[in-house]
C-alpha cells in the first residue's frame, strides 16, 4: 500500500537493515548456458538489432514504447521478445479484471511523456483520493487525504489497460519489431567493451545478436543468470490473493484505499468504480488456498470479518497509542478508525493467487546487457511499489541510453550503463529495504514489536509534515 513503505522501514533494527544490505550482494547465482547454435533445427543465420528486449509484459513493452518515442534513439532498431501469444487488446466496456496496479505520480508522468496516458485516461481508471492503514492488535492508524497533495494519492488501473496503451505505441513504431511466443533458450554476452555483440538463441532455434540486450524476463530471468550477478532472494512462504469485489449500496463515493494489517498478513481494498473494488490479500499458503476454494457467500463473509473483526489486543501498545494521542492533544474521535464499505459479492472466476517473495540483483548491468523490472528486483505488494519501480527503471534506462548515444557511447558500454545502475540502486534499495522491514515487523505478534510498530504508525499520523514527506516519496514526487 502506497505511503506505508517508508513510515516504519526505519523502525526495523539497524542491524537487520545492515545485514540485508550486505546480503543483497552475498548469494551467488550462476548457470551453465549452451551457446552452440549449430544444434538448432532452424537456420543458423543471425539477425542483428541495436536493442533486444527479452521479455514483454508491462515493463518490457513500456520500455519498447519509450525507446520508440525518444528522439535521440528513434533510429535504433528494437526487437521485443514476448513469450506470450499476441496481445488481443483491452475491452473498456468488459468486466473489470482482477490484475490491477496502484500507479503513482512518476509512472503517470512516464505514460504522459510517451503519449500512453491519453489512451488510459479515455478508457477507465480510478483515482485514489484518500487512504487509511490500520492495525488489528491496537488502535494505531494512519490516514492520508488528497487535499494534502497536488495530485491523487494513486490511480488504480487494470494491467491489461496499461499493456494495451503501450503495446499499441510499440506496434505502430516503424523501428520496433514484436515477436510473440518467443522464449530465450540461451544467451552469450561480450566479455568486455571491445568484444562482439550480445547473442541469443530462442527455444525454436532462431538466432539474434544486438548491441544491448535488456532483460525484462521476470524473476527467473535467463538474461540475469547469464550476467552471472549475485542475487539475494527470499521466499516469504506467503500467497497473495486477488479478486474483484462488488460493494454494498453504502459505497456512494468509493475513492478510498483501505489496508489493514492482520496477524497473517495485510488485506487491502482498492477502488475500481463506485460499486467495485479490487482485493489484494496477503496471507499464509494454507489460508489463501482455503479462501480461494470457499463458496462466494462464505468468501465475502470472511472478507468482511477480516476488516471488522476485533483481534486480541496488546494492552501495553494500546495504552501507548492513547498516551501518544493525548500528548499531541488529540482525543479518540479525531483518530478513530473508519471502516470500508461492506462487500456484498465477488465476481465469478476473479479469485487468483500468486506467491510472495523478495529478490534483488547486486548489479543491473554488464557489458552488452542491462536488467529492468522483476528481472532486477521483486518486492512484497503491501506497498504497491513493484511495478512502479519497474517503470522507474524504464525512465532511467531510456534517459541514460539517450545521453550515452548523444555523447557517442556504444549502447552496450558498461562504463555508461553503470550510470543507469547507480540511479536505480539509489532509488530501489531504500524502498525495498523499507518494504521488507514492514513485512518483517507485521509478520510477528511479539508484544514489544507490536508496541514499536504501533507507536511508529501513530507518531507519523500525529506529525503531518513527516506524514506528507513519506507520502510524497511513495507517490514518486
Curated annotation (Swiss-Prot):
Enzyme Commission no: 1.14.15.45, 1.14.15.46
Molecular function GO labels: 2-methoxy-6-polyprenolphenol 4-hydroxylase activity; 4-hydroxy-3-all-trans-polyprenylbenzoate oxygenase activity; FAD binding; oxidoreductase activity; oxidoreductase activity, acting on paired donors, with incorporation or reduction of molecular oxygen, reduced flavin or flavoprotein as one donor, and incorporation of one atom of oxygen
Organism domain of life: Eukaryota
Transit peptide endpoints, chain numbering: 1-25
PROSITE patterns in UniProt: UBIH
Membrane protein topology class: Peripheral membrane protein
Keywords assigned: FAD, Flavoprotein, Membrane, Mitochondrion, Mitochondrion inner membrane, Monooxygenase, Oxidoreductase, Transit peptide, Ubiquinone biosynthesis
Pfam family for this entry, one: FAD_binding_3
Listed InterPro entries: FAD-bd (IPR002938), FAD/NAD-bd_sf (IPR036188), Ubi_Hdrlase_CS (IPR018168), UbiH/COQ6 (IPR010971), UbiH/COQ6_monooxygenase (IPR051205), UbQ_mOase_COQ6 (IPR000689)
Catalytic activity from the UniProt record: a 4-hydroxy-3-(all-trans-polyprenyl)benzoate + 2 reduced [2Fe-2S]-[ferredoxin] + O2 + 2 H(+) = a 3,4-dihydroxy-5-(all-trans-polyprenyl)benzoate + 2 oxidized [2Fe-2S]-[ferredoxin] + H2O; a 2-methoxy-6-(all-trans-polyprenyl)phenol + 2 reduced [2Fe-2S]-[ferredoxin] + O2 + 2 H(+) = a 2-methoxy-6-(all-trans-polyprenyl)benzene-1,4-diol + 2 oxidized [2Fe-2S]-[ferredoxin] + H2O
Known function: FAD-dependent monooxygenase required for two non-consecutive steps during ubiquinone biosynthesis. Required for the C5-ring hydroxylation during ubiquinone biosynthesis by catalyzing the hydroxylation of 4-hydroxy-3-(all-trans-polyprenyl)benzoic acid to 3,4-dihydroxy-5-(all-trans-polyprenyl)benzoic acid. Also acts downstream of coq4, for the C1-hydroxylation during ubiquinone biosynthesis by catalyzing the hydroxylation of 2-methoxy-6-(all-trans-polyprenyl)phenol to 2-methoxy-6-(all-trans-polyprenyl)benzene-1,4-diol.
HAMAP family documented for this protein: COQ6_monooxygenase (MF_03193)
Name of the molecule in the record: Ubiquinone biosynthesis monooxygenase COQ6, mitochondrial
Organism: Drosophila melanogaster
Originating gene: Coq6
